[in-house]
Amino acid sequence: MIKNQGDRYHLIDKNALEEKKLDSNELTEFVKSSGLIDIGKKYNIVSIIGSQSTGKSTLLNYLFGTQFDVQNRQQSVGQTTVGIWISKDVKNNVVVLDVEGSDSVERKSGENMVENQTALMALAMSHCFIINVFVNALGQHTSCQLSIIKIIMQQNLKLFQQDTVKHIIFVVRDWDEEYNYDEASRKLNGYLLNIWNEIPKPDQYRETDFHELFSVQVVTLVYYKLKNEFAEQTNQLHSKLANQQDPNFIFKDFDYEKNVRWSDMPQYLSNIWVVIANNKDLNLPNEKILISNMRCQQIKLEALEGVKDLTEDLQNRVRTQFVENFGQQCLSILGVAQKIYDKDAKDYHADVYKEKEKELRDELMNKFYTYFQRQTESLKQHYMNRLSENLETLKRESIYDLPDKLNEVDLLKVNFEESLSKSVIEKGLWQEQDHVGFFNQQFDNQLKSFVEAQLASFKQQLDNIIKSECDKIVSQQVLNISPKFWSQIDADYYTMISDKYSKYDALLSGLRVQWKQIDDYLSKFEEDSFHNLKQVIAVASGRFKDQLFQQFKAQFVRTEDGQPRNWQKTTEEEIFHIYTEARDKVFSFLDILRIRKVKFIRIQQTMKKIAKTHLAPFTPLKEKISYQISADTDSDDVVLNEVFYTQVKMQLAEDIDVQYQDAIQKHKQDFLQNIPKPFWFLLLFFMYDDVLRWMGNPLFLYPILIILCFIGFCIAIGLHSLPKLAFQTVFRTINQALLPLIFGGISKLKTS
């Protein structure tokens, strides 16, 4: 059961004195029910001290409209107020303390400690002291409460930071015009100054003027039964204490921010009384800081609870995907928490307020940083997925379009950095640049792998293109072998490969390939391209014999204007001359092909390596040749090695000789066609029995069998033209030697 009666409360009662503690629950209930909790920090506390039974409670009731118990004049004089009562001005934010009177006869000897404790409690709470003194007691030490004032002065120096003035108002009761106000004021100020000079002071206050720390006023009141005048004077005093519009308002420069909020006052006063009641050193700033710590901690937790739903919602969303404007949403939550915190905490001790504000921010920032880590991973995954999608699309693009496309792809890095910048609350706070660097490295590695894969595919295509171009270049020369065969191949190949080289170089640079790797790519390109040229030449060498034979036929069989030659009208000497000229020409071409090697030279131009062929004259195989591709000289370096050269020359010679024999036969056909046909039948009639006899003769039969076996063997080993050449030689000999003898004998028989 709380003990408040109306709007008053017994703050320090017998239980508080005996148990040395306050009932904070009852005090809290009073603070709520009386409306004190609503005034926050905007208040002043006025307490009254004085001797017992001097009308202190009555004066307070007149001044502030309170309802403190007053002494019934018809009863015996005694103690009315025990300890400290607390109440509030009915209209203004002035809290009033009615302190137990001093010199109480009810207090036993040695119990003046209670008076000191209540005075100290009043001092800890009050901004202004009203010292109630009767005019006829001005010269009395105890009546003027000088001992209590001494305690107040001493403790005031210890308890308070001296940036505000403590107000002391002497209210001199039962004043009459016959008294000298100036004399009374001088006397009271003299008492205070003497006390100030007597009390020990800290070093910083030794030279301090008393009036810098205390504001002293002397107010006189007539006898209370002079109601009108007494009421007017009490109203004037009340205005000084409660009316902020009064020019004489004593709390004009008061810093209300230093007050303890009434919502925290029960705990604050409980802590103070425990210290005072146990005669311990009281430290009011520490007590205020303690209360501020406790309340700001509680308010901080309330602020965290107030944004709990918002933080959990943000956490749930960031778990599934990255959140747009993550940083702004974090700031919004911080703002809500700050608003909740400021609403109740901003009036507490400034340092504590800032400390707990920082703790609130740090706790939220720690949560946000955890979310930020997940946000960052989601952003990385999102943009890496977009990169993969873009690269999959680029696989279908021409590789020469990739440099421009890669510039477009690079925008993903910019977008990632922008999204990440929107995910932070303060630039650099969460080391977002480290995440940007890691993402860029991961991004570039995937891009590099893609480029390498595309280059590998392109290199295969480029090899095929080079092979095709080399085949065109070589084939063009093979179709018309000439002394410029090698020089033209060299020039055409160099022109083609230079163009491809420069484009390949530009492509590699556009694809962000590193300089050293570009050199490696280009060197490999040069070597592979030259190897392709060698392969094409090697394959084309199989066509050399046929092409040379065709070029021989073109010169031997046809005239310069392309018309077929008439061998019947051409003499054998002319045929032989044409044959010799055409044969020597193609053999000279064959020798050109034989005595050349294909060599690779790398020429350094403007820090670039350019592939070029070099057609070197044949060097005897015993002499070692140094190559920039290979240090070895093998048969592959020679276009026509000795074995292949001999084989081609033999086959070419055979085919050429066949053409020559055909021409001779066509020339001789005119002579045989002049023999009458009946003569051939007559010759066969007279010689058939001789033919049969020859067939039965082994000397004739065995040579025929040997000749047939020779023909079969030549066909089996691929020298099918050799029997033909042998028979042509035999028949040519017969035509030139035997037939003239035969037909000459026949002519003689006809003559005889």
From Swiss-Prot:
GO MF, one annotated term: GTPase activity
Residues in compartment: Cytoplasmic: 1-674, 720-752
PROSITE patterns noted in UniProt: G_GB1_RHD3 (PS51715)
Residues holding GTP: 50-57
Membrane-spanning parts: 675-695, 699-719
Coiled-coil annotated residue ranges, if any: 445-465
UniProt EC number: 3.6.5.-
Lumenal side, ranges: 696-698
Disulfide-bonded cysteines: none
Similarity remark: Belongs to the TRAFAC class dynamin-like GTPase superfamily. GB1/RHD3 GTPase family. RHD3 subfamily.
PANTHER family associated with the record: PROTEIN SEY1
Protein name, per record: Protein SEY1 homolog 1
Natural source organism: Paramecium tetraurelia
Top-level taxonomy: Eukaryota, Sar, Alveolata, Ciliophora, Intramacronucleata
